[in-house]
Amino acid sequence: MTATTSTTEPTTESPADERFVEHPLAPGRIAIHDPAIVEDNGTYYVFGTHRRCARSTDLVHWERFENNLTRDPASLLGGIWEAWPKQPENPALEGNTWAPDVIWNDVMRKWCMYLSVNGHEFRSVIVLLTADRLDGDWTYVGPVVYSGFNVDNVGRTDVPRVLGDEAAHGDLSRYASLKDTRINAIDAAPIRCDHGELWMSFGSWFGGIWMFKLDPKTGLRDYSVRYPLVHDSADPYYGVKVAGGYWNSGEGSYFVHRNGWWYLFMAYGWLGRTGGYQIR
């Protein structure tokens, strides 16, 4: 495919390579939003929003594949969808499975998928699914972290287990403040440290990016770890604040470990045509 540029203003002749840009069509083009890529035995697998999956052996030629999550998401997620994110403003599960990330768990000997199930007004939940093969079927394990809760519905989450009496009798107003910890439980990014610890970052916009420790035996939250309440730094439920907040953009956190350093990548702006979407 060839693209050309033109102008109504008088111009001088430009070299051909300045006026024509070649854009060869990508072979096997497959559109996947919020992609997470993982390699196993020489094959690369991509998982994305709305349960899109593809694989490749050369990172150029891709083919889609199906599993029970793509074919029948309600069979895996119907229970948690009805219990938390589903609302009149947001009635369909199919369009609300967002931004999965997949990691191998050495202790469980399973592939672990952390998937966001999105709801209206931040009433979302990140759940864990496991599989023996990346191109196989998935098993639902349970919720990892909730958002969008208040005093009226907090009993339907694991917040009371984490906060204890505070969830029933304490002040939960910080979880309703866009300048504090009113985050959206989406965009999970699990990481494995060199010494075997598992952590997961998550969050989006407004309240910033947070992370807490996972239990490698279950793949879920490590309930034995407690976090203090320190404004702008730590929260008993959401763990440790990593970045962002103050009603600013910032989502899709991702970590890369190189030469003893951890590097955090985040998306800024918004995804509209004029949103200035960028990764820093």
Describe each PLM feature range.
Residues 1-280:
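Carbohydrate-active catalytic/glycan-binding domains of CAZyme proteins
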